C-alpha cells in the first residue's frame, strides 16, 4: 500500500466500531478544533462517536450533517484532500441506513461509490454470495432470521444485501442496480471494477475472512490513491484492513497493567439483549463481584422517585467498594413495552441519564470501569466521564475495546475503560474481562 494513504474518517453510530483497531483517537465531540485533533493525529484512522443509533432519524440526520459541515472546514484547514469516509454501523444491519450515507454524500459530495460491508469476523458475522450471516453455535444463520431483524426500531426482512438496500432505500436503489463484489471477485482483485464506478454507485461486498477484506482494502486504497472517492457503510472488520495497524502495544491478557490503582473497579451494564443477560449471570458468579440491580419498571412508573433511587444505588456502591469488591450495576433485564418507538427512545434517555449520574458518583479511586452495551458505552465516554477525546489502547477480548482517560481527568485520571458491545463474546466473556483486569 502506498505511503500517501488517505486519512480514514469514521463516523461511528455507537462507540464500539473501534473494536478491531488500536492506538488511535476516539472523538466524543465534533466541533472544528476537535476534528482537527483527529485529522492531525499520527494514526491513519480516527473515530467520531456520533451515537446516532440511539437517536431518532431526524436527529441522526442533523447530527451527521453537523459533523460533515465541520469536517469540511477542518479538512481544508489541515490541507487534507485524500480521505475515505466510513459510516460505521451494526454488523447485524441495524441503524439509520440510508439516512446517514445520504447526508454524508450530500455534504461531502463527489463520491464514486458507497459500499455496504457488514462483515465482522470477531463477532461471527460473514457475507457470502451477498447474503449476510450470523454464525450461531457454529451454524451460519441468515441475519434476517435472528432477533436483530425484529429490532423494534430498525426491523428489516432481507439478508440478501441488494434486497436489504432496496427495502431500506424504499426502492430508490433497485436490488438489480447494486454492484455485487463476491468472494471470487475480491480474491482475484477488483481494482478495474473499482476504477469504473461513478455517481455514488451502491456496492455490496462479501467477506469470510480478514484476508478477503485485506485484499479488497488494498484495491480500494490503490483506487483512492488514483483519485477515486469512496464512502462505506460497514461494520468493524473493513477498518482493520484499511488502517493496517499491526498488533497492539500490550497483549489482551496483560491489559490489567494499565490500572492506575490497586483498588477494585466498577462495572455498568445497560444492554438488555439475551447474550448480555447470560454474560451478566456468569460475571455475578465471580469472586468479589456484587450485583446492584436498578429496577427500570419503577423508574418508568414512578419517575418522581429517581433521586431517591440514585442515592440508594450510590450508597450501595460505596459500601461494596469499601469492602474491596467490584459493584456490578445493571438494569433489570426485561425489555419494557411502550406505546410508540418515540416513547421507548425517550425512556432510553431517562435510563441512560440515571446510569451516567451513577458513573459520575463512582468512588474516585476505582482502578477500572467496564461498560456493557454500545449506547451505554457512548454515554459513559461523552456524558459520564465528559471526555472530548480518548486514546484507544486496543482490545482486551476480540471485539472489546479499552480506552484510557487523560492524566488530567478531574474525576478519574488514567482510568482504563472497557467498551463492551451488547452482542459480542461467549457467555464467559464478561467474566473473562473482569478476571484479566483483576490480575
What are the residue ranges of the model-derived segments?
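Conserved, well-structured core segments that form the ligand-binding/active-site neighborhood
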Residues: 133-313
Amino acid at each position: 500500500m502506498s505511503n500517501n494513504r488517505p486519512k480514514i474518517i469514521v463516523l461511528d453510530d455507537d462507540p464500539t466500531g473501534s473494536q478491531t483497531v488500536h492506538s488511535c483517537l476516539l472523538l466524543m465531540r465534533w466541533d472544528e478544533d476537535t476534528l482537527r485533533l483527529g485529522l492531525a493525529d499520527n494514526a491513519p484512522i480516527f473515530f467520531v462517536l456520533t451515537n446516532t443509533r440511539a437517536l431518532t432519524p431526524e436527529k441522526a440526520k442533523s447530527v451527521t450533517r453537523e459533523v460533515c459541515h465541520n469536517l469540511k472546514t477542518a479538512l481544508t484547514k489541515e490541507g487534507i484532500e485524500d480521505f475515505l469516509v466510513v459510516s460505521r454501523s451494526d454488523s447485524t444491519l441495524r441503524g439509520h441506513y440510508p439516512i446517514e450515507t445520504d447526508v454524508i454524500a450530500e455534504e461531502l459530495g463527489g463520491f464514486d461509490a458507497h459500499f455496504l460491508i457488514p462483515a465482522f469476523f470477531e463477532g461471527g458475522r460473514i457475507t457470502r454470495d451477498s447474503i449476510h450471516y450470523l454464525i450461531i453455535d457454529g451454524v451460519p444463520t441468515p441475519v434476517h432470521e435472528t432477533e436483530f431483524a425484529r429490532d423494534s426500531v430498525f426491523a428489516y426482512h432481507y439478508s440478501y444485501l441488494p434486497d436489504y438496500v432496496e427495502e431500506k432505500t424504499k426502492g430508490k436503489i433497485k436490488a438489480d442496480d447494486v454492484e455485487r463484489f463476491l468472494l471470487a471477485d475480491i480474491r482475484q482483485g477488483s481494482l478495474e471494477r473499482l476504477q469504473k464506478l461513478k455517481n455514488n454507485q451502491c456496492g455490496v461486498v462479501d467477506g469470510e475472512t480478514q484476508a478477503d477484506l485485506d485484499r479488497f482494502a488494498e484495491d480500494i486504497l490503490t483506487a483512492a490513491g488514483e483519485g477515486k472517492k469512496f464512502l462505506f457503510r460497514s461494520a468493524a472488520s473493513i477498518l482493520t484492513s484499511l488502517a493496517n495497524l499491526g498488533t497492539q502495544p500490550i497483549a489482551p491478557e496483560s491489559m490489567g497493567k494499565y490500572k492506575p490503582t490497586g483498588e477494585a473497579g466498577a462495572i455498568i451494564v445497560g444492554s438488555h439483549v439475551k447474550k448480555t443477560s447470560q454474560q451478566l449471570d456468569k460475571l455475578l458468579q465471580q469472586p468479589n463481584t456484587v450485583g446492584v440491580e436498578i429496577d427500570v419498571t419503577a423508574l418508568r412508573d414512578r419517575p418522581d422517585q429517581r433521586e431517591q433511587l440514585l442515592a440508594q444505588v450510590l450508597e450501595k456502591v460505596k459500601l461494596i467498594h469499601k469492602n474491596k469488591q467490584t459493584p456490578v450495576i445493571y438494569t433489570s433485564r426485561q425489555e419494557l413495552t411502550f406505546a410508540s418507538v418515540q416513547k421507548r427512545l425517550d425512556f432510553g434517555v431517562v435510563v441512560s441519564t440515571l446510569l451516567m449520574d451513577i458513573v459520575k458518583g463512582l468512588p474516585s479511586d476505582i482502578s477500572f470501569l467496564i461498560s456493557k452495551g454500545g449506547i451505554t458505552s457512548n454515554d459513559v465516554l461523552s456524558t459520564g466521564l465528559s471526555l472530548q477525546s480518548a486514546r484507544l489502547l486496543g482490545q482486551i477480548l476480540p471485539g472489546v475495546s479499552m480506552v484510557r482517560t487523560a492524566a488530567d481527568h478531574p474525576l478519574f485520571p488514567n482510568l482504563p475503560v472497557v467498551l463492551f458491545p451488547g452482542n459480542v463474546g461467549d457467555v464467559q466473556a464478561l467474566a473473562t474481562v473482569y478476571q484479566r483486569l483483576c490480575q
